[in-house]
């Protein structure tokens, strides 16, 4: 009887151990099994039909998407087929770049962007060449900067006041040559920089000569002091001894 009970308990223990092993293995397998990564791939919505973009937009040829017109010919491909960068930088028949084509044909200046866009200054007003701001013609050569590039004050010269009227004695500035005043501003700044550079060179030469003169004078004074210390004291001692030798004779003659 006892043996039968012992065998039953052993079977139950073995079955329980097997069940625990199965559960443990199942849990480990769940932890080790890689979780599939779900990736999301955006789907391109079908673009609008041809000719459906507003006049202020550009339509890509491949998918028909609408882009801002300023994105065209900006040296950055925005359409998948690159149609927004085609036929850019066209040239006029004489071979020079076309102005106002949004292409930077002058990397160091904004010459090809001058006078671009609508120039609708009313009569009696002038247009600043750099930013296109309209100013009254009476503000020209009034001693106050009204254009951001100082073009309204270039070529004015000195002014004299006679009978309440302001007169310019310099070169007259007209509407035709105001366009080129920004270039004169750059040239004047470069000339002023060269003048300042020349002045700095002159100041450096003067300072070097001054230092050299001071050093030479100090050397001469030092040499004279050494010579006096060695040779100038001997005559002084000789005079003292001669004075001592003459004093007894003087006293004897008096007696």
Swiss-Prot record:
Q: Name one GO cellular component term.
A: plasma membrane
Q: Where in the cell is it found?
A: Cell membrane
Tell me where the signal peptide lies: 1-29
Identify the keywords attached in UniProt to this record, alphabetized: Cell membrane, Disulfide bond, Glycoprotein, Growth factor, Membrane, Metal-binding, Repeat, Signal, Transmembrane, Transmembrane helix
- Where are the Extracellular topological domains? 30-203
Q: What sections of the protein cross the membrane?
A: 204-224
This protein's source sits in the domain of life called: Eukaryota
The annotated topology with respect to the bilayer is: Single-pass type I membrane protein
Any coiled-coil regions, as ranges? none
An example Gene Ontology molecular-function term: calcium ion binding
Q: Which residues are glycosylated?
A: 177, 183
What GO biological process terms are annotated to this protein in UniProt? Answer: B cell costimulation; cobalamin transport; positive regulation of B cell proliferation; vesicle-mediated transport
Residues that coordinate or bind Ca(2+) 1: 71, 74, 76, 78, 84-85
Q: Does the keyword Glycoprotein apply?
A: yes
Topology check: give the Cytoplasmic ranges.
225-255
The LDL-receptor class A domain is annotated at: 52-89, 120-157
What does it do? Receptor for transcobalamin saturated with cobalamin (TCbl). Plays an important role in cobalamin uptake. Plasma membrane protein that is expressed on follicular dendritic cells (FDC) and mediates interaction with germinal center B cells. Functions as a costimulator to promote B cell responses to antigenic stimuli; promotes B cell differentiation and proliferation. Germinal center-B (GC-B) cells differentiate into memory B-cells and plasma cells (PC) through interaction with T-cells and follicular dendritic cells (FDC). CD320 augments the proliferation of PC precursors generated by IL-10.
- Quaternary structure (record): Interacts (via LDL-receptor class A domains) with TCN2.
Official protein name in the record: CD320 antigen
Q: Which organism is it from?
A: Bos taurus (Bovine)
């Amino acid at each position: 009887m006892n043996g039968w009970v012992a065998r039953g308990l052993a079977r139950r223990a073995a079955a329980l151990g097997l069940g625990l092993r199965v559960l443990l293995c199942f849990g480990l397998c769940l932890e080790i099994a890689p979780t599939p990564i779900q990736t999301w791939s955006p789907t391109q919505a079908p673009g609008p039909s041809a000719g459906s973009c507003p006049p202020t937009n550009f339509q890509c040829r491949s998918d028909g998407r609408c882009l801002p017109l300023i994105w065209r010919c900006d040296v950055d491909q925005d359409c998948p087929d690159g149609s927004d960068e085609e036929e850019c930088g066209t040239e006029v028949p004489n071979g020079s770049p076309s102005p106002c084509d949004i292409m930077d044909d002058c990397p160091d200046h904004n010459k090809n962007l001058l006078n671009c866009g609508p120039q609708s200054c009313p009569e009696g007003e002038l247009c600043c060449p750099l930013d296109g701001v309209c100013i009254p013609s009476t503000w020209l050569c009034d001693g106050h900067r009204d254009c951001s590039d100082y073009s309204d004050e270039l070529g004015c010269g000195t002014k004299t006041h006679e009978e309440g009227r302001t007169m310019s004695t310099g070169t007259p500035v007209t509407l035709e040559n105001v366009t080129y005043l920004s270039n004169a501003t750059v040239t004047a700044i470069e000339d002023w920089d060269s003048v300042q550079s020349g002045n700095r060179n002159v100041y450096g030469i003067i300072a070097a000569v001054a230092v050299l003169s001071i050093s030479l004078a100090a050397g001469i004074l030092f040499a004279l002091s050494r010579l006096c210390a060695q040779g100038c004291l001997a005559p002084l001692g000789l005079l003292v001894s001669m004075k001592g030798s003459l004093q007894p004779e003087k006293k004897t003659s008096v007696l």
